[in-house]
Protein backbone atom coordinates (compact mmCIF):
# COMPACT_ATOMS: atom_id res chain seq x y z
CA UNK A 1 0.00 0.00 0.00
CA UNK A 2 1.34 3.39 -1.00
CA UNK A 3 1.87 5.94 1.74
CA UNK A 4 2.17 9.73 1.59
CA UNK A 5 1.99 12.44 4.23
CA UNK A 6 -0.62 15.11 4.80
CA UNK A 7 0.44 17.94 7.13
CA UNK A 8 3.41 15.66 7.90
CA UNK A 9 1.15 12.86 9.17
CA UNK A 10 1.40 9.44 7.48
CA UNK A 11 -1.54 8.62 5.21
CA UNK A 12 -2.31 5.32 3.47
CA UNK A 13 -3.67 5.32 -0.06
CA UNK A 14 -6.34 2.87 -1.14
CA UNK A 15 -7.17 1.69 -4.62
CA UNK A 16 -5.35 0.41 -7.67
CA UNK A 17 -2.17 2.25 -8.57
CA UNK A 18 -2.00 3.62 -12.12
CA UNK A 19 1.30 3.69 -14.02
CA UNK A 20 2.58 5.66 -16.98
CA UNK A 21 2.12 3.73 -20.21
CA UNK A 22 -1.02 1.88 -19.15
CA UNK A 23 -4.54 2.45 -20.44
CA UNK A 24 -6.38 4.74 -18.00
CA UNK A 25 -9.15 3.02 -16.05
CA UNK A 26 -12.69 4.33 -16.40
CA UNK A 27 -14.44 6.02 -13.48
CA UNK A 28 -17.81 7.52 -12.58
CA UNK A 29 -18.04 10.95 -10.97
CA UNK A 30 -20.66 13.70 -10.76
CA UNK A 31 -20.59 17.07 -12.48
CA UNK A 32 -21.85 20.25 -10.77
CA UNK A 33 -25.44 19.46 -11.80
CA UNK A 34 -25.34 15.89 -10.38
CA UNK A 35 -25.01 14.27 -13.81
CA UNK A 36 -22.87 11.14 -13.93
CA UNK A 37 -19.68 11.60 -15.94
CA UNK A 38 -17.06 9.06 -16.99
CA UNK A 39 -13.85 8.99 -18.99
CA UNK A 40 -16.02 8.18 -22.02
CA UNK A 41 -17.43 11.74 -21.91
CA UNK A 42 -14.02 13.02 -23.01
CA UNK A 43 -13.26 10.34 -25.61
CA UNK A 44 -10.81 11.42 -28.29
CA UNK A 45 -9.46 14.38 -26.28
CA UNK A 46 -6.20 14.67 -24.43
CA UNK A 47 -6.83 15.20 -20.73
CA UNK A 48 -5.02 16.80 -17.82
CA UNK A 49 -6.63 15.45 -14.64
CA UNK A 50 -5.80 17.60 -11.63
CA UNK A 51 -6.73 15.84 -8.39
CA UNK A 52 -7.10 17.90 -5.21
CA UNK A 53 -8.13 17.06 -1.63
CA UNK A 54 -10.61 19.97 -1.41
CA UNK A 55 -11.31 22.83 -3.80
CA UNK A 56 -11.83 25.17 -0.81
CA UNK A 57 -8.20 25.19 0.35
CA UNK A 58 -5.52 27.63 -0.75
CA UNK A 59 -3.19 25.11 -2.42
CA UNK A 60 -6.07 23.36 -4.21
CA UNK A 61 -7.49 26.69 -5.35
CA UNK A 62 -4.13 27.76 -6.78
CA UNK A 63 -3.54 24.36 -8.41
CA UNK A 64 -6.93 24.50 -10.12
CA UNK A 65 -6.40 28.05 -11.36
CA UNK A 66 -2.85 27.41 -12.58
CA UNK A 67 -3.68 24.32 -14.64
CA UNK A 68 -6.76 25.93 -16.14
CA UNK A 69 -4.94 29.16 -17.04
CA UNK A 70 -1.85 27.46 -18.46
CA UNK A 71 -3.60 24.69 -20.39
CA UNK A 72 -6.41 26.85 -21.78
CA UNK A 73 -4.46 27.53 -24.98
CA UNK A 74 -4.16 23.81 -25.73
CA UNK A 75 -6.61 21.49 -27.43
CA UNK A 76 -7.94 19.05 -24.89
CA UNK A 77 -9.62 19.28 -21.53
CA UNK A 78 -8.56 20.01 -17.95
CA UNK A 79 -10.57 18.17 -15.29
CA UNK A 80 -10.31 18.96 -11.59
CA UNK A 81 -11.50 16.08 -9.42
CA UNK A 82 -12.03 16.15 -5.66
CA UNK A 83 -14.21 14.43 -3.07
CA UNK A 84 -16.04 17.71 -2.42
CA UNK A 85 -19.80 17.77 -2.88
CA UNK A 86 -20.85 18.96 -6.36
CA UNK A 87 -22.64 21.91 -4.71
CA UNK A 88 -19.40 23.09 -3.08
CA UNK A 89 -17.55 22.82 -6.39
CA UNK A 90 -20.27 24.78 -8.19
CA UNK A 91 -20.25 27.47 -5.48
CA UNK A 92 -16.44 27.73 -5.69
CA UNK A 93 -16.56 28.19 -9.48
CA UNK A 94 -19.34 30.81 -9.22
CA UNK A 95 -17.74 32.76 -6.37
CA UNK A 96 -14.45 32.91 -8.27
CA UNK A 97 -16.02 33.83 -11.60
CA UNK A 98 -14.63 30.74 -13.31
CA UNK A 99 -17.09 29.58 -15.95
CA UNK A 100 -14.79 27.32 -17.96
CA UNK A 101 -13.34 25.23 -15.13
CA UNK A 102 -14.56 21.62 -15.17
CA UNK A 103 -14.87 20.33 -11.61
CA UNK A 104 -16.01 16.79 -10.96
CA UNK A 105 -17.02 15.24 -7.65
CA UNK A 106 -15.86 11.81 -6.51
CA UNK A 107 -17.80 12.19 -3.26
CA UNK A 108 -20.49 9.61 -4.02
CA UNK A 109 -18.44 6.41 -4.13
CA UNK A 110 -14.79 7.43 -4.64
CA UNK A 111 -14.79 5.63 -8.01
CA UNK A 112 -12.00 7.77 -9.45
CA UNK A 113 -9.92 7.57 -6.28
CA UNK A 114 -10.22 3.78 -6.10
CA UNK A 115 -9.46 3.28 -9.81
CA UNK A 116 -6.38 5.55 -9.66
CA UNK A 117 -5.12 4.61 -6.19
CA UNK A 118 -5.45 8.06 -4.63
CA UNK A 119 -8.00 7.64 -1.80
CA UNK A 120 -6.52 8.89 1.48
CA UNK A 121 -8.00 6.26 3.80
CA UNK A 122 -7.67 8.22 7.01
CA UNK A 123 -9.36 11.33 5.59
CA UNK A 124 -11.74 10.01 2.88
CA UNK A 125 -10.29 12.63 0.54
CA UNK A 126 -8.30 12.30 -2.67
CA UNK A 127 -4.52 12.67 -2.62
CA UNK A 128 -3.04 15.55 -4.58
CA UNK A 129 -1.98 14.14 -7.93
CA UNK A 130 -1.88 14.81 -11.66
CA UNK A 131 -2.57 12.45 -14.55
CA UNK A 132 -2.09 13.35 -18.21
CA UNK A 133 -3.86 11.11 -20.73
CA UNK A 134 -3.49 11.15 -24.48
CA UNK A 135 -6.52 11.09 -26.79
CA UNK A 136 -6.54 7.26 -26.61
CA UNK A 137 -6.61 7.36 -22.78
CA UNK A 138 -3.03 6.16 -22.36
CA UNK A 139 -1.41 7.55 -19.19
CA UNK A 140 1.57 9.59 -20.40
CA UNK A 141 2.32 11.38 -17.11
CA UNK A 142 1.57 10.73 -13.47
CA UNK A 143 2.55 12.58 -10.33
CA UNK A 144 1.50 11.63 -6.83
CA UNK A 145 2.55 14.48 -4.54
CA UNK A 146 4.33 12.94 -1.54
CA UNK A 147 3.22 15.67 0.91
CA UNK A 148 -0.45 16.47 0.38
CA UNK A 149 -0.09 20.16 1.19
CA UNK A 150 2.64 20.74 -1.45
CA UNK A 151 2.08 21.81 -5.04
CA UNK A 152 2.53 19.36 -7.90
CA UNK A 153 5.27 19.94 -10.48
CA UNK A 154 3.29 22.28 -12.74
CA UNK A 155 6.02 22.57 -15.37
CA UNK A 156 6.47 18.81 -15.83
CA UNK A 157 2.72 18.15 -16.03
CA UNK A 158 2.11 21.00 -18.48
CA UNK A 159 5.06 19.93 -20.63
CA UNK A 160 3.66 16.38 -20.83
CA UNK A 161 0.23 17.80 -21.73
CA UNK A 162 1.59 20.12 -24.41
CA UNK A 163 3.79 17.44 -25.97
CA UNK A 164 0.97 15.02 -26.74
From Swiss-Prot:
Disulfide bonds join 60-93. Keywords: Antioxidant, Disulfide bond, Oxidoreductase, Peroxidase, Redox-active center. It comes from the Bacteria. It catalyses: a hydroperoxide + [thioredoxin]-dithiol = an alcohol + [thioredoxin]-disulfide + H2O. The keyword Transcription does not apply. It is an enzyme of class 1 (oxidoreductase). Its EC number is 1.11.1.24. Homodimer. NCBIfam families: PRK00522.1. Thiol-specific peroxidase that catalyzes the reduction of hydrogen peroxide and organic hydroperoxides to water and alcohols, respectively. Plays a role in cell protection against oxidative stress by detoxifying peroxides. This is Thiol peroxidase. It comes from Staphylococcus haemolyticus (strain JCSC1435). The lineage of its organism: Bacteria, Bacillati, Bacillota, Bacilli, Bacillales.
